[in-house]
Regions:
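Conserved AMP-binding/adenylate-forming
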Residues: 1-2, 6-25, 29-119, 125-128, ...
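A structural micro-motif
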Residues: 20, 56, 151-152, 200
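General small-molecule cofactor/ligand-binding pocket signal
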Residues: 23, 202-205
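AMP-binding/adenylate-forming catalytic core of the ANL superfamily
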Residues: 82, 87-88, 110-197, 207-209, ...
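Acidic/polar alpha-helix N-cap and adjacent early helical turns
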Residues: 223-234
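Hydrophobic/anchoring residues in structured secondary elements
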Residues: 1, 156, 203-204
């Protein structure tokens, strides 16, 4: 995984079709490519990418002070170090320097580590939506919306505002036969989310941009939304 866990429906479909056990891990190309993984058994934890591999250290850092490690259960930037971490980018000292904090590699992902070491990814740092001075993690809102029976899949993104901030909006792939009900969805979200996390608007998409693993590509969906809004204004 990168930046998000596999949607539970993707896991269920794969396991039902193959009869196998899907065990999820997490890493990046710079990590050769994995640093965290679930146990190869039913001890795996759905919604989590697992625990650090042997000889690999992972910590959740305060985004405002990377020297400070967050308490268990508190969101922060995922940092890692270990023998599989790359040494740097070829002929690009500036990018290499930006990728590390001391000996720790900066993954660019936000996550949470529980008391027992299991890690849950929250969002790519670049995908965090800043609205009214608050940070909104798209994955948290998407997880709630995916449980709604009228929604097949969803991408929560920021809709740019003139003042430089963003509105939280949801781009929806509706279930067969379902109709878009913005007010009903807002009421549903208000019962489950803090007020500032509730999407201001819901957009129906026939298809949402995804990668080969079936994960939503939020930045592509956001670009599609912006193009759509610009076309509607013209």
């Amino acid at each position: 995984s990168g930046a998000s866990t596999l949607p539970s429906d993707t896991v269920n479909k794969w396991e039902n079709y193959t009869g196998g056990l899907l065990v999820e891990g997490y890493g990046l190309t710079e990590c050769s490519p994995i640093i965290v993984g679930n146990p190869m058994s039913t001890d795996r934890r759905p919604g989590y990418v697992g625990i650090p591999f042997p000889d690999t250290q992972v910590r959740i850092a305060n985004p405002d002070n990377l020297d400070e490690t967050q308490p268990d259960g508190v969101e922060g930037e995922v940092l890692a170090r270990g023998p599989q971490i790359f040494k740097g980018y070829l002929n690009n000292e500036e990018a290499t320097e930006a990728a590390f904090h001391g000996e720790w590699f900066r993954t660019g992902d936000m996550g949470v580590m529980e008391e027992d070491g299991f890690i849950r990814l929250v969002s790519r740092i670049k995908e965090i939506i800043i609205t009214g001075g608050f940070n909104v993690y798209p994955g948290e809102v998407e997880e709630i919306l995916r449980e709604h029976p009228s929604i097949d899949d969803v991408a929560v993104v920021g809709r740019p505002r003139e003042d430089g901030s963003e509105d939280v909006v949801a781009c929806l792939d509706l279930a067969d036969g379902a109709a878009l009900d913005p007010e009903g969805l807002k009421d549903y979200c208000r019962e489950r989310l803090t007020r500032y996390k509730v999407p201001r608007t819901f957009y129906h998409f026939e298809e949402l941009a995804k990668d080969q693993m079936g994960k939503i590509r939020r930045r592509e969906v956001q670009a599609d939304l912006i193009r759509r809004l610009e076309a509607e204004q013209n």
